[in-house]
């Protein structure tokens, strides 16, 4: 998949943006998005941005457009094919996930639509379920736009960092810098995952006291992991190679 993306993206800017739009669209499309490795595809596209093969702002616009199309088509699929979807085998097997999504939409529709955009399994489900619940369009459209604007750069970011790291000239200093950058990325992403895990356990009143990883331990582990990631991120700012990293990063953001 990655080699196909590479060859297609290097053909022309139009093809590149078409790939970003299609990936974002399929990632957001009802049920289809569940079958795609979203973070891998978007991170790969982010790598092309960091490496200079793809422009950041056109990719962002293309990603947002594809995301909105996927969201709104999914909403109408849920609205007009509700009865068929309830009898669909895949949804029957994942009834628990469907029920949780419904519950969150009933209680906090706006927050659920925005935050659900960043969670793999719920991303292609929430717009469809919003339609199935006949959520008023005015309650769906605004958070959908916000989520679709924020989602592409967040999912591109790990790839952008990787692409910049590849672009940094080889030296003994840059070698250690790249490994530090990878470690920091892992710590921060792991910290975010642990926080979301702890939050789910807290919301659902789950505490596996028989398991080694209790809610309390996961909470402390989340704090330690996230703190280590943030402190390491602060410390790496003083590394000599960070000047080169900032220069490349600002070039990407400024589009120069």
From Swiss-Prot:
Cellular component aspect of the GO annotation: plasma membrane
Pfam families: VTT_dom (PF09335)
Keywords: Cell membrane, Membrane, Transmembrane, Transmembrane helix
Membrane topology of the entry: Multi-pass membrane protein
Subcellular location: Cell membrane
Record-annotated membrane-spanning stretches: 6-26, 29-49, 61-81, 145-165, 175-195, 218-238
Record carries keyword Membrane: yes
Keyword Transmembrane: yes
Family, as annotated: Belongs to the DedA family.
Name listed for the protein in its UniProt record: Uncharacterized membrane protein BU139
Lineage of producing organism: Bacteria, Pseudomonadati, Pseudomonadota, Gammaproteobacteria, Enterobacterales
């Amino acid at each position: 998949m990655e080699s196909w993306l590479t060859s297609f993206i290097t053909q022309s800017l139009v093809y590149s943006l078409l790939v970003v739009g299609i990936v974002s669209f399929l990632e957001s499309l009802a049920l289809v998005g569940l079958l795609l490795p979203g973070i891998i595809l978007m991170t790969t596209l982010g790598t092309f941005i960091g490496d200079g093969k793809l422009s950041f702002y056109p990719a962002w616009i293309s990603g947002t457009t594809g995301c909105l199309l996927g969201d709104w088509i999914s909403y109408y699929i849920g609205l007009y094919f509700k009865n068929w979807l309830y009898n669909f085998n895949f949804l029957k097997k994942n009834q628990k996930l469907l029920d949780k999504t419904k519950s969150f939409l009933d209680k906090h529709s706006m927050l659920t639509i925005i935050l659900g955009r960043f969670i793999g399994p719920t991303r292609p489900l929430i717009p469809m379920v919003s339609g199935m619940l006949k959520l008023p369009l005015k309650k769906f459209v605004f958070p959908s736009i916000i989520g679709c604007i924020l989602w592409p750069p967040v999912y591109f970011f790990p790839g952008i960092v990787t692409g910049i790291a590849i672009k940094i000239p080889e030296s003994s200093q840059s070698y250690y810098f790249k490994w530090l950058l990878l470690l920091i990325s892992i710590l921060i992403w792991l910290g975010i995952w642990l926080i979301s895990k702890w939050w789910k356990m807290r919301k659902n009143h789950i505490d596996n006291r028989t398991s080694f990883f209790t809610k309390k331990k996961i909470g402390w582990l989340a704090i330690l992991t996230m703190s280590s990631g943030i402190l390491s991120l602060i410390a790496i700012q003083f590394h000599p190679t960070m000047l080169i990293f900032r220069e490349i990063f600002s070039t990407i953001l400024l589009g120069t």
